Curated annotation (Swiss-Prot):
Record's protein name: Glycine--tRNA ligase beta subunit
Catalytic activity: tRNA(Gly) + glycine + ATP = glycyl-tRNA(Gly) + AMP + diphosphate
PROSITE patterns xref list: AA_TRNA_LIGASE_II_GLYAB
PANTHER family documented for this protein: GLYCINE--TRNA LIGASE, CHLOROPLASTIC_MITOCHONDRIAL 2, GLYCYL-TRNA SYNTHETASE
Species: Lawsonia intracellularis (strain PHE/MN1-00)
UniProt-listed InterPro entries: DALR_anticod-bd, Gly-tRNA-synth_bsu, Gly-tRNA-synth_heterodimer
Gene Ontology molecular function, alphabetical: arginine-tRNA ligase activity; ATP binding; glycine-tRNA ligase activity
GO terms for cellular component: cytosol
One Pfam family linked to the record: tRNA_synt_2f
Protein location: Cytoplasm
Broad class of enzyme this protein falls into: ligase
GO process terms (BP): arginyl-tRNA aminoacylation; glycyl-tRNA aminoacylation
Family listed: Belongs to the class-II aminoacyl-tRNA synthetase family.
GN (gene name): glyS
Length: 695
């Protein structure tokens, strides 16, 4: 059995895309080879800043023989009425390389078709890989593409070399003007320009020992953690390992070498967030903490090699960071000597979106929304919420945020605290941009959550009104993130806020705005957009697609109750009588749907008990009223007992169908019975849309 290694050598790849790209490379090779009959024993993928690598073990040297059933044209097209093959059948057989007599008939969901066996295999694996490699590399899903030189080929970064070996044989192909060979490249600035690899089994050893490259990202991570912790222990501290930054640094180095640098103690007077932003975001380094979690005057950076002059490199890193911190100290001193009134005036000249006015106007709208939202949350104070909203954007014109945009909100909270605002208002301002992504927490405080909802819904309504609606992958204003943030807050904080009222209230706060879309169209499109995000949210949590569709389509205003509905519905679906219940409900749906289409009878769901003639319809009406009252007593939250009431209704529904002539000759009796079924359906649809279920 043979081992295949492919190494795509490039200019420095963006660190944030590395792990996804290496995984995609491995998955695509595995899927392609398995579809060709191969059964590799192991597929490994790796990446460094300058290479993507896949290693496949346990390959046959010759592609295994396998048969594939290929479906051709329908039987009535493949043969004429006399049973003679048509040109369609002849062409199909020719494409498969078989005779007409070898064709078979196969039954499918779409009817009767002809089929044939296509035999694959017998090709040398080296030839298979030579064709497969350029196909897979070209088809890799890349977040960005670029061209270089005169070649029309595009990739995420320029390709500089390609090594492709099947055991000791070169797998020959050409891509982007580069021919595959047996050469790899070591660490940049290494004395050896190219490393010849005799066989795929020699690759790892040569790359590490001669090239000085640690190929496996997990090994680089372990090395950084081990050596970094050791450096921090020398000065009695611990490294503040930021997982997101650590994963980025892993993608920036091929041979990690942690270096401990010092910070002038005078800078420790700066806010912790400012220090960490300067260290982590701008220098890609890590802070050092004492045993109490306070920052020490040190930082840890990770070099890409062992430097020839460690002291000189250390001095350079310290000088660059000190310049950053000097700027930060200057901005801090400038900001704390400025007033919020000055900043509020500057906000009037800072445009949010041209049709929507200034940031000052947005801040005012947000403050009004905060006051309105707070009234639905018993633990919050409406006046305090309005105050938090009115100060939410002042830090956008501060010197610190101009220099460090990622600190917006955070600095607003710090400045609010520094200028005497309450702790709750300061915390709310700091939390307003949470959650910043699907994996970050929602605001801890109710006031912060209120401010976050208000800010996000104002942005969504304003952008949709201007016709700025995300399409495809384009979302320059982060509207998907805004929608998901609102969804998560309402669900995780269990706030009883009606979505439609929230949209309308936000829209009403816009004054003298020329909308590109009609106001009612804005609300409709926005609601569809948020519901799509809502469904994706629950699918990501592992809920079944049809279950999500059944529940979400019936309850789109009170998001806080949807998770309980989903869980209750799942428990109901596990009952032994659930399948029969669904069939019964679908019968009700079909009867009402037919009446709506084929008759002029308008069904309202209101019935007249005096028109009941049979006991079965009286019993069904009584059972339905009990279920509806139970639902209303539960404040329409559709808990498990409410869903289980459907099972208690089922016998009455079945008896109604068995004993009652719905389509009575008496038009009034008929209308009354149909309205009873309509009322039943309206109640059922308030719980779930059973029509989407496939049972």
């Amino acid at each position: 059995m043979a081992t295949f290694i492919l190494e795509i050598g490039t200019e420095e790849l963006p660190a944030r895309f590395l792990l996804e790209l290496q995984s995609e490379l491995g998955v695509r090779f595995l899927d392609s080879l398995q579809s060709m009959g191969y059964r590799p024993t192991e597929v490994s993928d790796y990446s460094t800043p300058r290479r993507l690598v896949v290693c496949i073990k346990g390959l046959d040297m010759i592609q295994p023989h396998c048969e594939e059933v290929v479906i051709g044209p329908p039987i009535n097209i493949a043969f004429d009425k006399d049973g003679n093959p048509t040109k369609a059948a002849e062409g199909f057989a020719k494409n498969l390389g078989i005779t007409i007599g070898s064709l078979s008939q196969i039954s499918t969901d779409r009817g009767e078709y002809i089929s044939g066996l296509k035999v694959k295999g017998g090709i040398p694996t080296k030839e298979v890989l030579a064709r497969l490699c350029p196909e897979i590399i070209t088809a890799l899903p890349l977040p960005k593409r670029m061209r270089w030189g005169n070649n029309p080929f595009t990739f995420i970064r320029p390709i500089r070399w390609i090594m492709a070996l099947l055991d000791s044989d070169i797998v020959p192909f050409e891509l982007a003007g580069i021919h595959s060979n047996r050469n790899t490249v070591g660490l940049r600035n290494n004395n050896v320009p190219f490393i010849e690899v005799p066989s795929s089994t020699d690759y790892y050893m040569l790359l590490k020992e001669v090239g000085n490259v640690i190929l496996d990202p997990n090994s680089r991570k372990d090395s950084i953690l081990q050596l970094g912790n050791k450096e921090a222990q020398l000065i009695g501290g611990v490294v503040n390992w930021n997982e997101r930054l650590l994963n980025e640094v892993i993608g920036l180095v091929e041979h990690p070498y942690p270096l401990l640098g010092t910070i002038n103690s005078v800078f420790l007077n700066l806010p912790r967030e400012v220090l960490l932003t300067s260290i982590e975001t701008h220098q890609k380094s890590f802070g050092i903490l004492d045993s109490q979690g306070n920052l020490l005057p040190y930082f840890l950076t990770v070099l890409n090699m062992t430097p020839p002059d460690l002291a000189l490199v250390k001095q350079g890193w310290e000088r660059v960071l000190q310049a950053r911190l000097e700027d930060a100290r200057f901005f801090w001193n400038e900001d704390i000597n400025s007033s919020f009134d000055e900043w509020q005036e500057k906000l009037t000249h800072l445009i949010f979106l041209d049709p929507l006015g200034s940031i000052a106007q947005k801040e005012h709208r947000v403050s009004l929304l905060c006051e309105w939202i707070a009234k639905y949350i018993p633990t919050s104070n409406a006046e305090e919420a309005r105050k938090a909203g009115s100060l939410s954007k002042v830090d956008l014109v501060s010197k610190m945020v101009e220099e460090f945009p990622e600190l917006q909100g955070v600095m607003g909270g710090i400045y609010a605290r520094h200028k005497g605002e309450s702790e709750s208002i300061a915390t709310a301002i700091a939390e307003q941009y949470l959650p910043s992504g699907p994996d970050t927490d929602v605001p801890v405080t109710d006031l912060g959550a209120i401010l976050s909802i208000a800010d996000k819904i104002d942005t969504l309504v304003g952008c949709f009104g201007c016709g700025i609606i995300p399409t495809g992958t384009a979302d320059p204003y982060g509207l998907r993130r805004c929608a998901l943030g609102i969804i998560r807050i309402l669900i995780e904080k269990e706030y009883p806020i009606n979505l439609h009222q929230l949209y309308t209230r936000a829209q009403d706060n816009f004054v003298n705005v020329s909308w590109k879309l009609a106001p009612e169209d804005v609300l409709q499109k926005l609601h569809e957009f948020i519901i799509a995000r809502l469904k994706n949210y629950f699918l990501a949590l592992g809920y079944d697609t049809l279950v999500v569709e059944a529940i979400v389509s019936t309850q789109t205003s009170q998001l806080w109750s949807i998770k309980d509905r989903l869980d209750s519905f799942i428990l109901l679906s596990q009952h032994e009588d659930f399948s029969q219940l669904v069939q019964t409900i679908k019968r009700v749906i079909n009867i009402i749907k037919k009446q709506d289409k084929e008759t002029e009878i308008v069904l309202t769901g209101h019935w007249n008990p005096s028109l009941f003639k049979d006991t079965a319809e009286k019993v069904l009406a009584e059972k339905l009223m009990i279920a509806v009252n139970k639902f209303n007593q539960e404040s329409q939250t559709a808990s498990l007992p409410v869903f289980m009431m459907l099972l208690k209704l089922q016998p009455a529904i079945n008896t109604f169908f068995d004993q009652v002539m719905i389509m009575s000759n008496d038009i009034e009796v008929r209308r009354n019975r149909l309205n009873l079924l309509k009322a039943l359906l309206l109640y059922i649809e308030s719980l779930a849309d059973f029509s989407v279920l496939q049972i």
